[in-house]
Amino acid sequence: MTLYPAIDLKDGKAVRLTKGLMDSAKIYSDEPWMLVKKFEEMGAKWVHLVDLNGAFAGEPKNLEQIIKIRQNCKVKLELGGGIRDEDTIKKMLEIGIDRVILGSIAVKNPTFVKEMAAKYPIAVGIDAIDGFVAVEGWGEVSAMRATDLAKEFANAGVEAIICTDVSRDGTLSGVNVEFTLDIANACKIPTIASGGVKDESDIEALVSAKGIDGVIIGKAYYEGTLDLPKMFKKYS
């Protein structure tokens, strides 16, 4: 089980949202790179970054902070938020991002995502509300089922599927194991759970489910409901 500490970038700061609502942003650090360094020192192999401004603007907006993180930290980085064309993918990889997350574009242009997955290290972010895919920074809900979207990429060379239950994201209400397992079983691609993680019992439930490869940890760390250094020692 790979643990992915998460940092959402908004206006150059590290924040967390509740249920994806921008006006719910709570600032946890004015220097995101220092947080990433802290995760690295705890034992993180990966850190999950989301450019929130980018998700809404359709292009990365926190480049200065992303570059600063890369310059100061050796941990592997995956980045999502507003990455919707090949030039942006190449630019992110050139500045040292290890894996690019494609979200909204996966619904609107799955062929493009498959082409990119054949050339670059790509993860697909599937964010869902009541089982249906949410797009455009979670501002819209599509008519596509999350499991159907996952199946679309079954043999495309995608490195990972990151599935988020939007209704639980940032709520500390517990991870949706069943939803994550449905996605994992639908596509047979390494699947990472996201949304609602509160404490060690959530990590244990994901490990016990067998078939889920990773978990994104955000507010549970920031609010102190999960002992992250202990989790790295136990599960990494």
Swiss-Prot record:
Subcellular location: Cytoplasm
InterPro entries in UniProt: Aldolase_TIM, His_biosynth, HisA_bact_arch, Isoase_HisA-like, Isoase_HisA-like_bact, RibuloseP-bd_barrel
Residues at the catalytic site: D8 (proton acceptor), D127 (proton donor)
Coiled coil: none
EC number: 5.3.1.16
GO biological process: L-histidine biosynthetic process; L-tryptophan biosynthetic process
Class of this enzyme: isomerase
GO cellular component entries: cytoplasm
Keyword Membrane carried by entry: no
This protein's UniProt keywords: Amino-acid biosynthesis, Cytoplasm, Histidine biosynthesis, Isomerase
Catalytic activity: 1-(5-phospho-beta-D-ribosyl)-5-[(5-phospho-beta-D-ribosylamino)methylideneamino]imidazole-4-carboxamide = 5-[(5-phospho-1-deoxy-D-ribulos-1-ylimino)methylamino]-1-(5-phospho-beta-D-ribosyl)imidazole-4-carboxamide
SUPFAM superfamilies: Ribulose-phoshate binding barrel (SSF51366)
Involved pathway(s): Amino-acid biosynthesis; L-histidine biosynthesis; L-histidine from 5-phospho-alpha-D-ribose 1-diphosphate: step 4/9
HAMAP family: HisA
Family: Belongs to the HisA/HisF family.
Name of the protein in its database record: 1-(5-phosphoribosyl)-5-[(5-phosphoribosylamino)methylideneamino] imidazole-4-carboxamide isomerase
Organism for this UniProt entry: Sulfurimonas denitrificans (strain ATCC 33889 / DSM 1251) (Thiomicrospira denitrificans (strain ATCC 33889 / DSM 1251))
